[in-house]
Structure formats: structure tokens, C-alpha cells
């Protein structure tokens, strides 16, 4: 597992992962991960960082190897670009602008916003905007930009992620709380001023330096790609796509069954039933009006052979 175990002490030192916050700005719960203090700054124990980071990378690879998805969350300024780039590279989802309350716990409502965003994008592409007044188009464009900013990273997320990766749990505490309520595992890059409670996979490290953020985010992305490759190699991706298609077909059949026969079919059925009853009533009347009883079809069929015999 190149991605799951591909992090070294040298990489951590070069990225400045070991630099924590000032000693007066610390959370006592991070004490087990602190090596010591130097010049009023806590130094993080990188040996523990290596072990815990590798464990997190393996977990992510296993998640994506089973077809699961990972949600990258980094809304602080120095994390936004890195998180967006790496999550996109890995084919995963991300939140970099602002965490909307209920993104996980009220995903049904979030999907309504996503549907609205897709509708506006379609209107812009198919020329609908060109037929609308300029003032209305400007309003719709502003709405689309706002939705893209907040929901663009989860636009293709059709179901809840199997894992959430956050930069700076102190800032992303709402996301962590929502994931905890739903039982979604959380991986976090946790600095010395953060509370590690609620983080399933703690990665002790500097969550402010861009190089540190880049290092761990890229490793998580590589773990996602590694797991996705295993998933495709196993053939599970094709099976899941087939099951999803069959599920859509089944849902369509159930909708048709609930609708019942079409109106035209019901009219045809009534006409057929009425014609049979009408024929039954008219049959005896014809026989009564005639001078002689009307022969049935069956005797005629039986009489045919006698006629043939006479001809012979």
C-alpha cells in the first residue's frame, strides 16, 4: 500500500507538522500527543503522528475499496484551495466555503438545493436565460453562484459519505457533531489547541501551515485513489451500477402498477363487456322474429360431411 503507508518522518519535518500552538493556547486533551515545548510553542510527537496517519490512510483506502465515498472539509482560508484540488483529483466530495447546518443530518433538504443548482445550470446551458429579461437573469445568476459556492463540492453526492476528513476540528466542530450523530467516522488533522473528542482517527499535526495541510490532504486523496482502483479491479463497480439500474427499473414498474390501467384501456374493457351482454340479449329476439328457428353454427359444421357424401 504505497498511499496507506507512504509517509515518512522526513516529510513531516519538512512540512513543519511538528509545530503546535503557543503553550498558553492548548487543549489539555492533546497532552498525549505532545513531545514537549520550545520557545513557548508545543512540539508534536511525530512518531505518534506517523503511526496514526498510516492507520487513517489504510482506513480510507478500505472505505473506497468497498465503493464508499469520503467528504473533505476545510473551510479555513489556507485549506480551501488544497482541499478542493485534492478532493477533485480523488473524485471525492468537498466543502470549502461554509458548512451549511444540516449538510449531513438534513441531507434531504440539502439535495433540494443541489437540484435547484442543477436546474439553473441547465437553464444557462440550453439558452433559457437568453429568452428572459436581463434583470431576472441577473438574479438567477447570483442565486446560481451562491449555490455553487456552498454546494458545488457536493453536487454529485447522491448519498451520505462513509467517512469525513476535516482540517482543524475546532473550526469544523459542527461537521464533526453531525457526523457523530449519524455514526459516520471522522478523520481529523488535530493541532494542540483542538479537542480530539469525537474524532475517530486523530492525526496530530500542524493544521495552519499550508505545507502540512497539503501533505495530509494529498495522502488522503492518494488513499482514496488506491481504494478506488481496488474497487474497480474487483468488478464490484460494475455490479453496483447494474444493481442501481435494476433498482431504477423496479421503481418504475412499481409506479406503473400503482397507476393501474390507462383511461383508454378501461373504456375498451367496458365496451367489450357491454358488447357481450348486448349480444346475449339480442340473440333470442332474432330467433323469435324469424319464421323458422335459426340453426346454430355447430350443427352446420356437423352437416358438412353429409353434403360431401351426397356429392360423391
Curated annotation (Swiss-Prot):
One of its GO terms (molecular function) is structural constituent of ribosome. Residues 232-312 are annotated as: Disordered. Residues 291-312 have a biased composition (Low complexity). GO terms for biological process: translation. SUPFAM superfamilies: Ribosomal protein S2. Residues 245-284 have a biased composition (Basic and acidic residues). It comes from the Bacteria. Belongs to the universal ribosomal protein uS2 family. This is Small ribosomal subunit protein uS2. It comes from Myxococcus xanthus (strain DK1622). The lineage of its organism: Bacteria, Pseudomonadati, Myxococcota, Myxococcia, Myxococcales. The gene is rpsB.
Amino acid at each position: 500500500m504505497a498511499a496507506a503507508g507512504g509517509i515518512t518522518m522526513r516529510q513531516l519535518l519538512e512540512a513543519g507538522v511538528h509545530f503546535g500552538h503557543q503553550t498558553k493556547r492548548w487543549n489539555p486533551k492533546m497532552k498525549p500527543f505532545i513531545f514537549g515545548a520550545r520557545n513557548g510553542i508545543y512540539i508534536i510527537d511525530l512518531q505518534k503522528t506517523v503511526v496514526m496517519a498510516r492507520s487513517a490512510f489504510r482506513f480510507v483506502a478500505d472505505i473506497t475499496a468497498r465503493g464508499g465515498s469520503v467528504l473533505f472539509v476545510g473551510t479555513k482560508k489556507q485549506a480551501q484551495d488544497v482541499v478542493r484540488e485534492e478532493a477533485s483529483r480523488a473524485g471525492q466530495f468537498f466543502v470549502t466555503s461554509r458548512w451549511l447546518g444540516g449538510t449531513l443530518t438534513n441531507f434531504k433538504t440539502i439535495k433540494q438545493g443541489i437540484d435547484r443548482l442543477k436546474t439553473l445550470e441547465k437553464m444557462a446551458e440550453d439558452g433559457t436565460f437568453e429568452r428572459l429579461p436581463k434583470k431576472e437573469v441577473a438574479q438567477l445568476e447570483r442565486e446560481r453562484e451562491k449555490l455553487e459556492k456552498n454546494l458545488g463540492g457536493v453536487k454529485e453526492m447522491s448519498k451520505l459519505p462513509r467517512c469525513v476528513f476535516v482540517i482543524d476540528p475546532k473550526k469544523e466542530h459542527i461537521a464533526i457533531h453531525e457526523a457523530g450523530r449519524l455514526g459516520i467516522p471522522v478523520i481529523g488533522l488535530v493541532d494542540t489547541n483542538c479537542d480530539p473528542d469525537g474524532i475517530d482517527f486523530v492525526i496530530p499535526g500542524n493544521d495552519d501551515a499550508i505545507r502540512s495541510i497539503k501533505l495530509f490532504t494529498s495522502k488522503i486523496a492518494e488513499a482514496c485513489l488506491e481504494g478506488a482502483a481496488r474497487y474497480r479491479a474487483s468488478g464490484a463497480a460494475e455490479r453496483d451500477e447494474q444493481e442501481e439500474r435494476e433498482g431504477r427499473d423496479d421503481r418504475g414498474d412499481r409506479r406503473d402498477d400503482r397507476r393501474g390501467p390507462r383511461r383508454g384501456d378501461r373504456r375498451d374493457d367496458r365496451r367489450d363487456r357491454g358488447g357481450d351482454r348486448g349480444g346475449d340479449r339480442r340473440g333470442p329476439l332474432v330467433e323469435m322474429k324469424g319464421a323458422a328457428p335459426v340453426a346454430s353454427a355447430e350443427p352446420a359444421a356437423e352437416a358438412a360431411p353429409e353434403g360431401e357424401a351426397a356429392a360423391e
